[in-house]
Amino acid sequence: MKKHFNLTIGNKLVTFSSIVLVIFGSLMVASAEMGNSVGDTTYLTRVIVKQAIFAFIGVISYFAIMNLKLYKVRISFYYIFYVGILFALIACRAFGAINGAYAWIWLGSFATIQPSEFAKVFMIVFGAKLFSKDGTIEKNRNAFVKYGIMAIIYFIVIFKVQSDFGSAVVLGVICYCVMMIPPIKGIKKYQNWMSIAVIFAILIVFFLLSEPVTNWMKGHSDNYMIGRFLAAADPFLYRYDNGYHVIMSLVSFANGNIFGLGYGNSIHKYMNFPNPSNDFILPVIVEELGIIGFFGLVIAYGLVLVPLMYGSLKSKYTSTKIVLLGVFVYFTIHFILNVGGVGALIPLTGVPLLLISSGGSSLLASMMSLGFAQAEMVRNRYIDEDNSR
């Protein structure tokens, strides 16, 4: 049996680095939540236990999915999952908003489910299934349009019904990348149009951050989404309002310096962040572990993502390319939006730092996505030269 490429080292790196990040994230969640434990002697214990449960389920899911034969799952099951996730996304509206977003389903007082996190991963594996074979031009176009419509429906529900701008952006970027990968005939024209649309979208973002537009926005700063754009343009101008938390984030970065104050010694987590263990966990990490800690985090992410990119470039199978590159984009866009938001480079989006931030849904979804990626890499390891999908 001839192997097209061997990713044994890459697979081990992904597994080892992922588990290290999960453990590190759990420790940092415990540290970040110290500020909320004042006056409640059992709060921190509950947080640690809950995070440990999520981490355990995530790791088990990772290894279980790694052994899945994704290509054998019928397309009809994907449509069932799609509808199920869609209903879950809409059902979130029946529950209370958190920071202006209706993105969670409450399971009593113990935990929540965020369906949008699973929607992101689903659209990756669904795209891999839908575009795995090159059919006739008509079939290819129908599949392309079908995927686009289904992605738009998810995007609209997350953006309008849930009011979750960050998750909508992540989903949109993932689906765009998935649709740009297939080299199948008959869709090149549509892919070119999508590229033009993305260029316009980027120009619109720069336009929204320009001085004339931000001056107009000042009269509507009570809107939380507009307030985030204003805070990104000039956080110090809104230091008592929308820019306060961003400024405190920058102060935490400066306070951490090179080596940090030491684990558990962050000062600003006690009073200056609305979600110190989620959206703003990076300032806590840098304040306690310094710039050295941040670079260590970047290296660990690199050990997870580089093998995915390498496998995507080496594989000759469209489905493998979509899964590996889709997961790569999923992690990368989360990292960019989270770091850029707390670093005052872009508006805050509320997206978590995958494998690090608190939240069972994001941890489980991210570990599942890596499991799907590993399943594809393992499959490519042992596939026959003449074996086709």
Task: Give the location of each predicted region.
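Hydrophobic, glycine- and aromatic-enriched re-entrant/interface helices and adjoining loop segments
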Residues: 192-293
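Hydrophobic alpha-helical segments of polytopic membrane proteins
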Residues: 78-79, 83, 145-157, 165-217
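Loop-to-helix entry and N-terminal half of a specific, functionally important transmembrane alpha helix
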Residues: 309-349
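Alpha-helical transmembrane segments of multi-pass membrane proteins
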Residues: 21, 88-92, 129, 155, ...
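Structural signal for the C-terminal ends of transmembrane alpha-helices
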Residues: 60-71, 127-136, 176-187, 208-210, ...
